[in-house]
Every structure is written in structure tokens, then in C-alpha cells.
């Protein structure tokens, strides 16, 4: 969504998210169906490079920095977890399911970085709404939500 050949392109997941982010920012967004749906990224980014793109921002959802600790809030699976009844507010208990999700998302982020490197495109990962530990603070998830939050601050 935006102008093919823009020097800077933002990659995010989901066409609706990209449409809204473009409408809010005027920037060019390349939308993938999901963070691990990278099969078409190489040819599309290569074509965009030929049209003038030089820099790619990875703007996937912030659950890429999901805190992988038990809080009894992840899903129905929490009730089946042996840690579910523990007092997770007083101790840090690792959550295997959240760690698996975070690892899967980060594989997609790394794949985008590899593609950019192979094509000779510079890139950077965008983050927002992080806590002091660098994990997602769980207030603002997508780049579209972030842009809306910025507008409400003004």
C-alpha cells in the first residue's frame, strides 16, 4: 500500500493493518498475511528495490517481544498447565507456550532480515510499547495501533 519504489518501506502483517497504517502515516507498507508467510517477500522486495527502495523497516506486531512468563492469561491451555494454580504474581514462572509463540514470530522477523541482507537492502526492526526489560508492555500491539496512539497523544 503506498508508492512502489519509495526509498523506505515498512513490512507488516495483514492488509487491513497496512491500509490503516498507510492512511495514518502516508508511508508505504508491504503487507504479508502473517509474520512467517515470507514466500513472496524476496521477489516483491527485489522489484521494489529495482524501483528505488533502499530501506526496509520490519514493523511486525509487538508480540514478537511477548514476555514469556506465566500470568494465567494466555489461552484456555493455561488451565491445563501445571503452573496455572501457582502464584505467578509473586514469582516469575516461564511459559512454554508463550516462548514457542515468541520464537515462531522471531523466525519470521529473522527471515525478513535475511532477505533484506541478500538483496542488499538496509533494514531495522521497529519496536514500541516496551517495558524496562525490553519486552512488550501489552498496551499497543500493531503498527496501526501505535500510529493511532500517537495521534491521540497530540
Regions found by a protein language model. Give the residues of each.
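TOPRIM fold recognition
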Residues: 2-9, 15-154
Amino acid at each position: 500500500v503506498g508508492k512502489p519504489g519509495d526509498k523506505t518501506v515498512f513490512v507488516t502483517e495483514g492488509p487491513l493493518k497496512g491500509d490503516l497504517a498507510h492512511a495514518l502515516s502516508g508511508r508505504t507498507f508491504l503487507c504479508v498475511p502473517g509474520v512467517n508467510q515470507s514466500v513472496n517477500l524476496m521477489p516483491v522486495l527485489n522489484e521494489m528495490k529495482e524501483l528505488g527502495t533502499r530501506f526496509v523497516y520490519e514493523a511486525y506486531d509487538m508480540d514478537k517481544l511477548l514476555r514469556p512468563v506465566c500470568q494465567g492469561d494466555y489461552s484456555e491451555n493455561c488451565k491445563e498447565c501445571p503452573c496455572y494454580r501457582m502464584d505467578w504474581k509473586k514469582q516469575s514462572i516461564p511459559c512454554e507456550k508463550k516462548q514457542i509463540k515468541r520464537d515462531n514470530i522471531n523466525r519470521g522477523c529473522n527471515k525478513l532480515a535475511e532477505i533484506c541482507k541478500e538483496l542488499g537492502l538496509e533494514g531495522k526492526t521497529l519496536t514500541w510499547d516496551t517495558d524496562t526489560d525490553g519486552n512488550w508492555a501489552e498496551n499497543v500491539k500493531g503498527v496501526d495501533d501505535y500510529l493511532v496512539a500517537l495521534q491521540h497523544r497530540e
